[in-house]
Amino acid sequence: MKKFFIYLIFSLIISNTSLAKKSGCTGGNCNNGFGTWTYTDKTTYVGQWENGSKKGKGIETWPNGYVYEGQFNDSKWHGEGTLKFPDGSSYTGEWQNNKMHGKGIFKWSDGKVIEGKWNEGEYVK
């Protein structure tokens, strides 16, 4: 369970892409359409944009191996999505404002699984 909370805390940290300094649109339309944005730390977002914000389907990839693939709203993880960790662990389920929120499944790389509900990033049942 301790490892789960470490993953949870790290997912909250990396989900705040405002920590990554913006470098710019490196392909497509990053205002209204489909485009690629690359940050100075080499984090990338490839997906849909609306009014300059991530909205709709997209993939956010960090140089250290973390990958979020799913729905975005107002540049936040929001809706259905999967966060994959470098060690092979993953969370698939509902997100709200960059936090696990609603039904989801957390799978550790060793095969352990927690399935249930999350409330603002905390497992409730």
Give the role of each language-model region.
Residues 3-5, 12-125:
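Glycine/tyrosine- and acidic-biased, solvent-exposed loop/turn segments at the edges of beta-strands
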